[in-house]
């Protein structure tokens, strides 16, 4: 969320549009609500003054209902859902969904809105995130990359699946396959998998945004672990760097990863119930990507250039925020 705000603000400011971050910083021409907001009264007053209120929506919190994440996390997740639902139904004058999947999910659960809605994919700076530049991609091993901000609160299941994927890939091939995890992982969880996985696994911890392009270029494949992700930035960034993506067909992955930009395979069960996934099919698809890098890497970059550029995203948001200004 912070990454999106920073990129959008920079894009707007480069077009001569001032950006403020508090409802008290009047005057302003429109309000973009990114995530939850505590000052619902202030938001309502802005709408009453005739100021457009645009809500940007991804998905909803749901993993906490299936996995034990603690009472505090459960209540926080439900509270977050309630705030988003209230803004969507009572306050917003326009809605921007991050993907068709996100729109369909919200409309299935809570019905369509009476206000206009758009779908705008997340974008990335195609000059900063590109296939050319420093990298340390190994020549005699295959590197599978997992990028998540934080693997906790139920999202630990993504690491478990990534380990299972690499185990099966290693069983199919004699060439070494290593798993690199970029993101916050509890030390106890790191130790558990280092002792139990029986594969080469390296935990990088949280990686600074400016280092992500080199990290992406240094891998052969990104495994997108987030189930039912609305529009994961890690996928957008990987594609821009020419890194093919492998994932199960959940969330918006099939919208983002098209043609030879990667491989999206059926989950093999009910992902909404966290059924065990079909790792054999994903491993087979992943190995196809690994042995045909010359086919998949250019296609990944081409997909990003066609649809996922930052300028394209900024212009789309600008048309919603300030119609006619573009």
How would you name each of these model-derived features?
Residues 85-116, 124:
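A short, active-site helix/loop in glycosyltransferases that binds the activated sugar's phosphate group
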Residues 107-108, 123-140, 214:
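Acidic anion/phosphate-binding donor-loop and adjacent secondary structure
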Residues 134, 277, 281, 290-321:
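A charged, aromatic-enriched C-terminal amphipathic alpha-helix characteristic of glycosyltransferases
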Residues 135-167, 180:
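Conserved donor-binding/catalytic core segment of Leloir-type glycosyltransferases
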Residues 149-150, 163, 175-190, 205:
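Glycosyltransferase donor-sugar binding loop
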Residues 190-213:
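Nucleotide-activated donor-binding/catalytic signature segment of Leloir-type glycosyltransferases, i.e.
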Residues 227:
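Aromatic "clamp/platform" in nucleotide-sugar-dependent glycosyltransferases that forms part
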């Amino acid at each position: 969320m912070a990454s999106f705000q920073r990129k959008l603000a920079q894009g707007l400011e480069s077009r001569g549009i001032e950006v403020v971050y508090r409802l008290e910083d009047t005057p302003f021409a429109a309000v973009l609500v990114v995530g939850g907001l505590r000052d619902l009264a202030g938001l309502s007053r802005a709408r009453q003054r005739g100021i457009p209120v645009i809500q940007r929506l991804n998905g909803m919190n749901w993993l906490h209902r299936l996995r034990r994440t603690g009472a505090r996390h459960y209540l926080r997740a439900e509270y977050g859902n309630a705030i988003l639902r209230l803004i969507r139904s009572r306050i917003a004058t326009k809605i921007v969904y991050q993907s068709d999947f996100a729109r369909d999910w919200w409309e299935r659960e809570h019905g369509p809105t009476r206000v206009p809605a758009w779908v705008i994919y997340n974008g990335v700076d195609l000059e900063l995130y590109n296939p050319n530049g420093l990298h340390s991609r190994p020549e005699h091993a295959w590197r599978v990359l997992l990028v998540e901000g934080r693997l906790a609160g139920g999202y630990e299941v993504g690491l478990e699946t990534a380990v299972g994927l690499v185990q099966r890939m290693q069983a199919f091939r004699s060439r070494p396959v290593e798993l690199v995890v970029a993101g916050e992982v509890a030390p106890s969880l790191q130790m558990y998998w280092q002792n139990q996985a029986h594969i080469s696994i390296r935990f990088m911890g949280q990686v600074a945004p400016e280092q992500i392009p080199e990290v992406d270029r240094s891998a052969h494949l990104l495994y997108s672990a987030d189930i039912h992700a609305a529009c994961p930035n890690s996928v957008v960034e990987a594609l821009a760097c020419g890194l093919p993506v492998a994932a199960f067909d959940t969330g918006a992955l099939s919208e983002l990863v098209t043609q030879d930009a990667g491989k999206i395979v059926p989950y093999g069960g009910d992902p909404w119930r966290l059924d065990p996934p079909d790792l054999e099919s994903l491993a087979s698809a992943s190995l196809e990507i690994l042995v045909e890098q010359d086919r998949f890497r250019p296609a990944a970059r081409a997909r990003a250039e066609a649809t996922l550029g930052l300028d394209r995203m900024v212009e789309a948001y600008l048309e919603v925020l300030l119609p006619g200004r573009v």
